[in-house]
Regions:
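Penicillin-recognizing serine hydrolase domain
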Residues: 2-108
Length: 108
């Protein structure tokens, strides 16, 4: 996961996308109907539901949850100008995920 994410952040557009809090798009579906869809980030650092550790700037990331993998987060952040990719897999729940990630970020 690190290798994929590290390659992806080399693309400036990817960095912009992962840091987007919400996005609304208008499109035409396969039946020819005009549609509007809104995407809202589930990254609690970006929504403000969880505080970013002092001195760390969260740029964005990828969240996910499955029964096998638990709650997961791949996060791109910076301390000063130095970039970091931090990963937490198999957290029991979202609260635990952000507690673990916060502790990891504090070690930077």
């Amino acid at each position: 996961m690190y290798l994929i994410f590290n390659t992806a952040i080399q693309n400036e557009e990817f960095e912009k996308i992962i840091g987007t809090r919400n996005h609304t798009e208008e499109f035409t579906n396969a039946s020819g109907e005009a549609m509007t869809k809104e995407w809202i980030t589930t990254n609690k650092f970006l929504t403000g539901e969880k505080d970013q550790p002092e001195g760390i700037q969260v740029i964005g990331g990828k969240t996910g949850t499955t029964s096998n993998a638990g709650s997961c987060l791949v996060l791109y952040s910076k301390k000063g100008e130095k970039p970091y990719i931090s990963i937490v897999f198999k957290a029991e729940n979202a609260d635990g995920l952000y507690e673990e990630m916060t502790q990891l970020l504090k070690e930077i």
